Amino acid sequence: MSFPVAFLLVLFLVPFTFATNNLVVRQKELEIVIGGEVSVNFQIKNHTSQSLNATRISLSQSPYISHPDAILVDNWNANVTVLGSQLVSGAILEALNCTTDGSITCPLDLEDAFARITVIRSHFLAILIQIVGWTYFFAWSISFYPQMYLNFKRKSVVGLNFDFLSLNLVGFCAYAIFNLLMYYNSHVKNEYNIVNPRSPPPVLLNDVVFAVHAFLACFITILQCLFYERDNQSVSSKCIALMIVLISFGFCSAAATVLRKIQLLSFVTSLSYIKMAVTCCKYFPQAYFNYTRKSTVGWSIGNIMLDFTGGTLDILQMILQAVNVNDWSAFYANPVKFGLGFVSIFFDIIFMVQHYVLYPNAEVPHNEYHGVDNPNPDNIARDAEQYAGDSESMESTEPIIVHD
């Protein structure tokens, strides 16, 4: 047998050689109401001996859940009934050890023999949490479209700050790569599991979809800036400098990973820092731009309303989850998530005040906005020259006023 063929056979057979006598729990996430019960199934996979069918499995103990100390395997399965004693966000039930035929050495691989059990206050709250979660996911996902539609309708991006757009693109690019690696890359997931054993996955498929979709939406909006009227707007030198710093930080982290100075998980984490920095900075340019123009024309209030809805519901979901399991650690153990959500809501309120209170009757200097047709500036000048006559002023053309 040639070496390449033998090598391929070894690669193919190695997983099956070592993936034997595994004790597994298929349903890793379980949820029960306090005082309720749930059955947890342990199963032996790829067994190599009939004697394993009489294995005694010792289980971990927790003050939040009640169950027998040990269970016996029957027909390669062992079931245990767990009672929810106290509210908890995720108690771990795991196989600690096992014995077979009086042997003190456990012949089973117990690495995957665990389940996370959440004891909740109410199923109604659990359903409400899911509804709120999907609602804010939907609100955030479509929040990019009002601005794109407004740009398309006006054939203009005047009023949309380019610093905000540029920072948003950098932030969501980093966030998309972060989610893709955390969800799909096996090395990243293995490193995360080593650092955070028995923890639920930090990134779900909907996180990946949202991040990639947000990046594409930002990219399309920037393409609109290349083709539509933009007046003399450009990306400021301060924004360019900040983006260079953020991108350089990402590349340096990537280089350190390639040179094995840091782990791949550390590089992925650095991408989340870029997103956090962008979120803290990106709203300032647009808010100041609206202030200097004394107008929010060109800046979609629909985008803000949807973002405000998503941010508010996100925090509401955190509150409902905390109430349902009597665990408020999400607010102080992970202050970054709560803080970034609060920053977004704070600026959304500022934008709403600017739009509805400070500058509600701003003049529209462009061709169309909210269905109101406005005179072309060139036509105004030409008509003024034609009909001014002896008039000393060309101020006869009044601006169109938009009343929201």
UniProtKB/Swiss-Prot annotation:
Family, similarity comment: Belongs to the cystinosin family.
Ranges where the PQ-loop domain occurs: 125-191, 266-327
Keywords, comma-separated and alphabetical: Cytoplasmic vesicle, Glycoprotein, Lysosome, Membrane, Repeat, Symport, Transmembrane, Transmembrane helix, Transport
Catalytic activity: L-cystine(out) + H(+)(out) = L-cystine(in) + H(+)(in)
Membrane topology: Multi-pass membrane protein
Keyword Nucleotide-binding attributed: no
Subcellular location(s) of the protein: Lysosome membrane; Cytoplasmic vesicle, Phagosome
Cytoplasmic side stretches: 145-163, 229-238, 286-295, 359-404
Single Gene Ontology MF annotation: L-cystine transmembrane transporter activity
Gene Ontology CC, one term: phagocytic vesicle
Glycan-bearing residues: N46, N53, N79, N97
InterPro entries: LC_transporter (IPR005282), PQ-loop_rpt (IPR006603)
Coiled-coil regions listed: none
GO biological process, one term: lysosome organization
The organism of origin for this protein: Caenorhabditis elegans
Transmembrane region(s): 124-144, 164-184, 208-228, 239-259, 264-285, 296-316, 338-358
Topology, Lumenal side: 20-123, 185-207, 260-263, 317-337
Function of the molecule: Cystine/H(+) symporter that mediates export of cystine, the oxidized dimer of cysteine, from lysosomes. May play a role in the degradation of engulfed apoptotic cells.
Protein name as catalogued: Cystinosin homolog
PANTHER family reported in the protein's UniProt record: CYSTINOSIN
